Structure formats: structure tokens, C-alpha cells
A protein has these predicted regions:
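Helix-breaking motifs and short loop linkers at transmembrane-helix boundaries and internal kinks
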Residues: 46, 78, 99-104, 133, ...
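Cytoplasmic helix-loop-helix junction between adjacent transmembrane helices
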Residues: 109-146
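Helix-loop-helix hairpin linking two adjacent transmembrane segments in secondary transporters
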Residues: 143-193
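Flexible cytoplasmic inter-helical loops of multi-pass small-molecule transporters
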Residues: 186-211
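Conserved MFS/SLC helix-loop-helix module at the cytosolic interface between two early adjacent transmembrane helices
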Residues: 65-103
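Residue-level signature of mid-helix packing/kink "hotspots" within the transmembrane helices
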Residues: 32, 60-68, 151-152, 265-273
């Protein structure tokens, strides 16, 4: 059983990895709803693109910029059930967003939704690594593909549920948040037992990379952070404005634009899995270089292509950009395995 005192603490705990992947799927599916509703709220409230950008800024600050701080706190003060608490924030934010009727309330709502994600990611990633049994690339791939799969399916669900029925239909996704919170209780129970197990069964062979200076570690980590920043900058631009670009340039419907966004996000999910496998086979460094350089030509071609080739370029750029995520994260955990 997973709950209570788990019977398996050593080796790869596949049941926990699968639950981590499912939790990540639900979390990122909910998070991807935010940019998916931009066309709705822009038309309903007559927002400018600058106002949409500020909504994205508030959402990203809460969901991404806060993550290092919540992760630092989680390192020093592990809270196994913080996963469920974070998802409760997301649930509250969704309900607020569904019934927000002014700009400030929308900003507050998306910030609360983002805060839930910021609490979720560091602890869930730690649980996945603890359950890996040393197979870090496998664990990271399972965890990441869950999140990217959720990000891909979110716009489809928005097109099927929110676009036809309006802003209030966002409240239906609170059920997904509730389900995720319940699932995360089981993760929290395993994590709590694991913390006790680590205290009573100290590891003798944990390598902390003490032969590398702290300055070199943080220098390498800074490079990895800059790489992640550049990739998320591009990804955030696509998820926030790609639908508007397609609607304006090609005159397609909002529903069709969401399906086109799904093409990018699906490629992102595929690229994460493929990149993890290629990194293990050919070396993470080469995958990272390919990811940095390979997407640029398609991004440059995209504004000048017709709809078909725009989607082809979108798919290929998403595939290539996502390929390095697992490698970058594993590099970071190898640099600082104790954090």
C-alpha cells in the first residue's frame, strides 16, 4: 500500500512515479486553461493586448518566479501535504476566475491559481526523484510527460467546455483540482513515510559533488536557469498570443485556434519524452545544444508561412524546444542532489 507505512522504500517505486505523473497532468491541465481563455475575456471585457500581457505576467510570477522560493522553503522545512494545500489554492483561484467581473479580480484569481502550481512543482519533483531508485531520467520523463500532456489537453478542453458555455464554465475544472488534491494526499502519505525512513536508514553513498566548488556549482546552475528561462519565454509567448496571431492572420475561429495551439503543446509533450531517451543514449549536452539551435529556423520562418506550414513549424519548434527539458533538470539535480 502507498498510504501509511509504505512497504517499498528502496528501488524504483513505479506506483508513486505514476501518481506523480497523473498529479502533474491534472495540475498543468488546469494551468493551461488560463492562456486558453484569453480570447474569451479579451472580447468580453474589451481588454487590450497589454492587459492580456499583464495577466500573463501576474500568472507567471505566481506560478514560476515564486517556485525557487517555495522550493527553498520545502528543502528546509519539508511539508508532505503541501501538495494538497497547493491544489486547494488552485481550486479557489479557479472558482474566483469563473465569476470575476473586473480586471483586478481576474489578476488576483490567476495569481492564486499560479500560486498553487508554485507550491506543487518543487515538492512533487522531489517526490519523483525520491521514488526513482536512481533512475533519474526515467523519473523525470514520467513526471514531465504528465505535465506536458496536461498542458496539451487543456486547450482542447477549453475549446469543448469553456468556449461554448462561457467564462462560468471554468468552475467545472474545480472538479479536476479537487480530484488532484485527493490524489496528492496519497503522495503526501508516501513522502511523509519516506522522510521517516531516511532518518532511520541513513544513506551511506550519497554523493554531494563536494569535489566541485560552490562557485562552479552555482555558475553552472545559473547557465541552466538561463536556458530554461529562454525556453519558457518562447513557450509563454506562443501559449499567450499564438491563438490571436492565427485568428488575425488567417481568420480562423477561436475553437480552431485552440486546436492549433494543441499542435504545439502536443509536440512539446512528445519532445520531452524523446529528449529524455535521446539524452540517455547520445548525451545530455548534445540534446541541449540541438534544442538551443534547432528551433530557431522554424521560429524565423513561421511569420511568413501559410497556415499549413505555420502549423508544421509550430510542431517542429515545440518538439525541439522541449527535447532538452529533462536533460537540463537532471543536470541541475546532479549538481545539487541534496536540494
Amino acid at each position: 500500500k502507498i498510504k501509511g507505512n509504505p512497504t517499498k522504500m528502496e528501488g524504483t517505486v513505479y506506483s508513486i512515479l505514476i501518481i506523480c505523473g497523473i498529479s502533474h497532468f491534472l495540475n498543468d491541465m488546469i494551468q493551461s486553461i488560463i492562456p486558453s481563455i484569453y480570447p474569451i475575456i479579451k472580447d468580453k471585457f474589451d481588454f487590450s493586448f497589454a492587459q492580456i500581457g499583464i495577466i500573463t505576467l501576474m500568472f507567471q510570477m505566481a506560478s514560476s518566479i515564486l517556485q525557487p522560493f517555495t522550493g527553498l522553503y520545502a528543502d528546509k522545512h519539508p511539508r508532505p501535504y503541501a501538495l494538497s494545500v497547493g491544489m486547494c489554492f488552485t481550486l479557489i483561484g479557479l472558482l474566483m476566475l469563473a465569476f470575476s467581473e473586473n480586471y483586478l479580480l481576474i489578476l488576483l484569481s490567476v495569481s492564486i491559481v499560479g500560486l498553487g502550481s508554485s507550491v506543487f512543482h518543487p515538492t512533487a519533483s522531489r517526490v519523483a526523484q525520491l521514488a526513482s531508485g536512481g533512475r533519474k531520467s526515467l523519473a523525470q520523463s514520467i513526471f514531465q510527460v504528465g505535465g506536458n500532456g496536461g498542458s496539451a489537453i487543456g486547450p482542447l478542453l477549453a475549446a469543448l467546455i469553456i468556449l461554448p458555455f462561457g467564462q462560468h464554465a471554468i468552475s467545472w475544472f474545480a472538479l479536476a483540482a479537487l480530484l488532484a488534491a485527493l490524489i496528492m494526499i496519497r503522495l503526501g502519505a508516501w513522502y511523509k513515510a519516506r522522510l521517516v525512513y531516511v532518518v532511520t536508514h541513513p544513506q551511506k553513498n550519497v554523493t554531494l559533488n563536494n569535489d566541485i566548488s560552490k562557485r562552479a556549482k552555482y555558475g553552472a546552475l545559473l547557465i541552466l536557469v538561463l536556458l530554461i528561462f529562454s525556453k519558457y519565454f518562447y513557450t509563454s509567448c506562443i501559449t499567450s498570443y499564438f491563438t490571436f496571431f492565427l485568428i488575425d492572420k488567417f481568420g480562423i475561429s477561436v475553437q480552431a485556434s485552440q486546436l492549433c495551439l494543441f499542435v504545439f503543446l502536443a509536440a512539446f509533450a512528445i519532445g520531452t519524452v524523446a529528449g529524455g531517451m535521446l539524452g540517455d543514449k547520445f548525451g545530455r549536452k548534445y540534446v541541449i545544444w540541438f534544442s538551443i539551435l534547432g528551433a530557431a529556423p522554424f521560429a524565423l520562418i513561421m511569420p511568413f508561412a501559410n497556415l499549413f506550414w505555420t502549423l508544421v513549424c509550430t510542431f517542429l519548434s515545440g518538439l525541439i524546444i522541449a527535447s532538452a527539458f529533462s536533460s537540463i533538470v537532471v543536470y541541475a539535480t546532479d549538481l545539487m542532489p541534496d536540494k
